[in-house]
Amino acid sequence: MTNTVTVLAESTGFSAVNTIWVLLGAALVFFMQAGFAMVETGFTRAKNAGNIIMKNLMDFCIGTPLFWLFGFGLMFGDGKFIGAYKGIADSTYASAAPDGVPFFAFLIFQTVFCATAATIVSGAMAERTKFISYCIYSAIISLLVYPIEAHWICGGGWLADLGFHDFAGSTCVHMAGGVAAFVGAAILGPRIGKYDKNGKAKAIPGHSLTLGALGCFILWFCWFGFNGASTTSMEGDAIPLAGKVFVTTNLAAAVATITTMIFTWIKYKKPDVSMTLNASLAGLVAITAPCDTVSPVSAAIIGIVAGILVVVGVEFIDQVLKIDDPVGACGVHMLNGMWGTIAVGLFSDGTCGEKGLFTGGGAHLLGIQLLGMVSVIAWVAITMTIVFQIIKHTIGLRASEQEEILGLDVTEHGLVSSYADFAPAMSQAMLSYTKDDAKSVVKVDKSTEPVVPVEKAIKVESYATDAPSADGTPKMTKVAIICKQQKLNDLITALEDIDVTGVTVTNVLGCGMQKGQPEYYRGAVVETNLLPKVKVEVVICKVPTRAVIDAAKAALYTGHIGDGKIFVYNIENVVKIRTNEEGYDALQDD
């Protein structure tokens, strides 16, 4: 079998080792999708985990046929600005493949690179983007935006003729994806609760740094294929070059990670885990363009700058520009893609082209790199602004207020939780949410007419008696209110208005199925559905029970089934442990 393959390779002019090298690289770059999915899922909230996984899956699945049908032709067709389209990707474009590599091996290699550029946007627009709108974006970037700018650099376009150098995609993949992410996040607006009324940024922590770290390690591992296999050969001079690429890639990432750890340790008094994970990716992005043409010392310097740039960039975008990027995609990919592009013009040792400014080559290469960087930024920014604005003003770009607060897993996909048998954690940002935090989203609760009266929407079940206590002291009553999570702030405000200040809030799951609105899992109807709710409990003595019930109804009522339930119970006694007071006295404020 081995001899047959060798003879066939020789007779067709293909190189078995080069083909294997390219296919191995394609497999590793494909697996980067899993890395991105884990990073984005871990850095965001659990209620959106399924939605993020779905978006990463669809990035690749939508992009693959579109790149095959149209994108590859635009990227590798003849022409300096736009490739001349000659039909779907087939042997017509065989001349685009590197020496010794079959066309279809080269096609899959380019396909996975296109998918990488598309998936970068997912993290920056996470937790508030309509799924259908994201799918449309994904199709357009794979069909048109990426192939055209990549043609300029990798497909024999005008930047390639000028000597622009982007070995594995700092510019055409990462910077382009980062710019698209920046534009999308800016047009989309911040998540509910991200900024207070004064515009100060508030942290919305991700639910699993463990998943984020797993994604980071997957991406680091796969980056050896992303950069290393971009040699497209393992023969002749490409053999030592591949080793050099592996070393510079690894070194830049490691140094960037150390730099950010030290920088955040000094800045925040403790080393920041999420920023340090971002730094590993920032170093990888920055070294992707110059990895073949810089020395290990230069790679370390590139890593140092990347480690500082990612922290400063993420903070600037988040706190100064007020653009909400949940995973730091803009700081990692856009800013460090720019830095990697510029680094070629500064540190190139001439291995694969001109020398850079700091290595005796003057400013010529740096000028070309800057021209290419600005050109790609302009192309992506303009086209993606048009795309996102059209989507925004037609089918809508952003999920509704109610959908965002409940989570896109349940509202977009009917998925109550991505973690079976685990109750979702209640976000601190959700607890402090106010209507003013979401001026750019649709107010769902106010947009529809009530369909049932308040008595049916909010049922009251009383287990309390009206008889006074045996010793004549004021009667104590517990009121338990089950309601939607997004109504919690309104309810607490209403209770405070009637001088009920002590409340206990518990995260619970409610079981129910609304008529005419079945949910499906793998095609089967889900007969019961556990939905996230909150239980608010108050024990009252001085405040009338009826006043609490009326206040709760006023705060929770929308006129739809599921507004909530109120339970009323007798309380035999209350003991305040600190003062040993009992009964009425134990319920009074100090």
Where on the chain are the PLM-derived regions?
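Glycine- and aromatic-enriched membrane alpha-helices
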Residues: 3-463
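Positively charged, small/polar-rich N-terminal and surface patches that mediate targeting and assembly
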Residues: 411-415, 430-590
